[in-house]
Amino acid sequence: MSEIRSLHEVKGYVMNMKQEKSQVLEAIIIILVIATWLIGVIAYAYAPDIVPIHWNLEGKPDNYAPKDIGLFLLPLINTGLYLFLYFIPKIDPNNEQLKHSIKTLQLIRLGTHGLLGMIEIWTTLSIIEASTVKPEWIFSIISLFFAFLGRAMADVKQNYFVGIRTPWTLSNELVWDDTHRFTSPLWFYSGIGMAIVSALLSFMGFGAEIILTVFLIWIAIIVIIPIAYSFKRFREEKKSIQ
């Protein structure tokens, strides 16, 4: 009896630890969302009435809006995205599956809101200083974001909102799992590599147009390969059943 009680105590301790980690992650995510609003509020007093909201590949503003929109549109989007991603496990038809991927979903949300927070800082500084931005560096940041997603997505369970959602992954759970285990290192290592390549090209004096071209080719590759892989795995599974 004492051994059974000890086993239950260990399980309870592990569950409490997981819950505490989940709560800490959720708190960090909420702080990131609130931080984007605080950045806008602090910058409001220093920003002109009309501010840039879009920059061309040369880093120069090419579209403007009142500062209420320029400073608070991204925080508003960030908040809406937080609510949407938070409630995904509750509205997804496969919500029982997603309950086993809460940590993975939290990591994906953490990376997403972290990316939006960096963009908010980047654009707000440009608004306050009335300076051009360096669009070359955004490619490195987004590449690292994909690397982060790759690291997080390996264990995400089948669902309709997050992950590699193709007709073949959604119709076969094994194909879903294999596709994500395949895609995870692909995105992680190539994301780090693309971030380094973007930084090197910028350092060597190549313009944003060249870096954008390389970046888009990379995006196409890391999107097409998992789709093709999921189709290949689906056909293999179908043949094995026949």
What do these predicted regions represent?
Residues I141, I210-P226:
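Small-residue-rich transmembrane alpha-helices that serve as helix-helix interface/gating elements
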Residues K18, F234-Q242:
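Short, charged juxtamembrane terminal tails flanking transmembrane helices
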Residues P167-T183:
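Short membrane-interface loop/juxtamembrane segments of multi-pass integral membrane proteins
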Residues I29-L32, N63-T79, T132-L149, I217-W218:
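Alpha-helical transmembrane segments
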Residues Y86-K134:
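Ordered, amphipathic secondary-structure segments that act as subunit-interaction surfaces
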Residues Q19-L32:
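Alpha-helical transmembrane segments and their helix-start/interface "positive-inside/aromatic belt" motifs
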Residues I42-A47, T79-D92, F148-R165, Y229-E236:
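Membrane-water interface of transmembrane alpha-helices
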